[in-house]
């Protein structure tokens, strides 16, 4: 089953946070291609406005520049929304080790703000970005939900905390939450540059230049 087989009410409204990012912009594009309304919320701190400029002029698309750390912004963005796809977060394990407080503010408080705004606005489903990093130091393969070790970075801890809040919001308030544990996602509009770039685009960039990638381990 592909995304084109998904069916929602014809007037459904989706809010994509971090919508100008790599994953978020692809979600915006897919939903617009299905004919549904999309609101893109992004503060453009890491998102690229060029990723979403192609949607300008589409009557089903609205861009909101705002920060999920601000609850009022989240509340307004969720008004009249049916589905939230929360992708807004700061990535990179190494950078989180350098900036643990900043990561907690963005990835935990920001996601909690979005869950609360979704709850108060009667959102039907709340899907958020978690990470494979929540499996921590558990050596078992393949990875399985419910079998996790100790997390190894502030970034992983923010995602594990998000999952706990997601579980509580479902149990206590009935918000239908789903966390997606991404494993090295790659695709269009991903940035292969910089010291914090993901491993797959880094490898591809080197291979395209006929250079050997370094594999640790």
Where are these regions (language model features)?
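N-terminal Rossmann-like NAD(P)+-binding domain of SDR-like oxidoreductases, especially those catalyzing
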Residues: 1-185
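Short, polar/charged, Gly/Pro-enriched helix-capping and turn/loop motifs at alpha-helix termini
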Residues: 110, 141, 192, 213-214
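Residue-level signature of the cytosolic catalytic core of signaling kinases
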Residues: 57, 192-196
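Short, charged/polar low-complexity linear motifs in solvent-exposed/disordered segments
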Residues: 153-154, 196, 210-211
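A conserved pocket-lining segment of Rossmann-fold NAD(P)-dependent short-chain dehydrogenase/reductase
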Residues: 96, 146-148, 175-177, 181-191, ...
């Amino acid at each position: 089953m592909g995304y084109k087989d998904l069916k929602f009410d014809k007037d459904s409204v989706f809010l994509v946070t971090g919508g100008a990012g790599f994953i978020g912009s692809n979600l915006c594009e897919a939903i617009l291609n299905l004919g549904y309304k999309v609101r893109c919320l992004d503060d453009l701190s890491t998102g690229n406005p060029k990723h979403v400029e192609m949607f300008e002029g589409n009557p089903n698309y609205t861009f909101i520049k705002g920060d999920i750390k601000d609850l009022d912004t989240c509340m307004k963005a969720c008004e009249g929304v049916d589905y939230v796809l929360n992708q807004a977060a700061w990535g990179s394990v190494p950078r989180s080790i350098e900036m643990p407080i900043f990561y907690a503010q963005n990835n935990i408080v920001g996601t909690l703000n979005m869950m609360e705004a979704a709850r108060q606005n009667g959102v039907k489903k709340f899907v958020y970005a978690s990470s494979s990093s929540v499996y921590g130091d558990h050596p078992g393969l393949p990875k399985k939900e419910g079998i996790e070790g100790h997390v190894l970075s502030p970034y992983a801890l923010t995602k594990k905390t998000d999952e706990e809040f997601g579980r509580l919001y479902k149990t206590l308030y009935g918000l239908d939450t789903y966390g997606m544990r991404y494993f090295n996602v790659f695709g269009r509009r991903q940035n292969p540059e910089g010291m914090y770039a993901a491993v797959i685009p880094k490898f591809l960039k080197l291979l395209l230049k006929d250079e050997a990638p370094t594999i640790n381990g």
